[in-house]
């Protein structure tokens, strides 16, 4: 199971966001196998998370560890309700 979250950091907030996310995950997150943080050329931060199962992913979204709630004050809002675009689904292929 893979989830991807895209946010647009406020000016000079990239390092703060990365540090907050890494600090919140330093002791591990149940079911999170690997995560990557990418700073794109379009002033976006892209988080790619690999989960052991959909259940682990859903549990995380509903927990107090929810990444979006942690960083939303450092992000530009997309609309009234959202600071991110999020996608999730099964991993169909991964090369070695």
Task: Describe each region flagged by the PLM.
Residues 37-42:
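A short beta-turn/loop motif at secondary-structure boundaries
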Residues 1-4:
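Extreme N-terminal starter segment of soluble prokaryotic enzymes
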Residues 6-18:
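Short, surface-exposed ligand-recognition loops at beta-strand->loop->(often short) alpha-helix junctions
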Residues 8, 48-50:
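Short hydrophobic/aromatic beta-strand micro-patches
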Residues 16-28:
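Short amphipathic alpha-helix segments
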Residues 86-96:
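Short, low-order "capping/linker" segments at domain edges
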């Amino acid at each position: 199971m893979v989830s991807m979250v895209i946010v647009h950091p406020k000016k000079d907030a990239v390092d703060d966001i990365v540090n907050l996310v890494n600090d919140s995950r330093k002791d591990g997150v149940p079911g999170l196998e690997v995560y990557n943080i990418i700073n794109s050329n379009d002033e976006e931060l892209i988080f790619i998370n690999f989960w052991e199962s959909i259940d682990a992913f859903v549990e995380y979204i509903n927990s107090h560890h929810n990444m979006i709630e942690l960083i939303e004050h450092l992000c530009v809002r997309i609309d009234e309700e959202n600071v991110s675009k999020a996608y999730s689904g099964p991993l169909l292929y991964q090369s070695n």
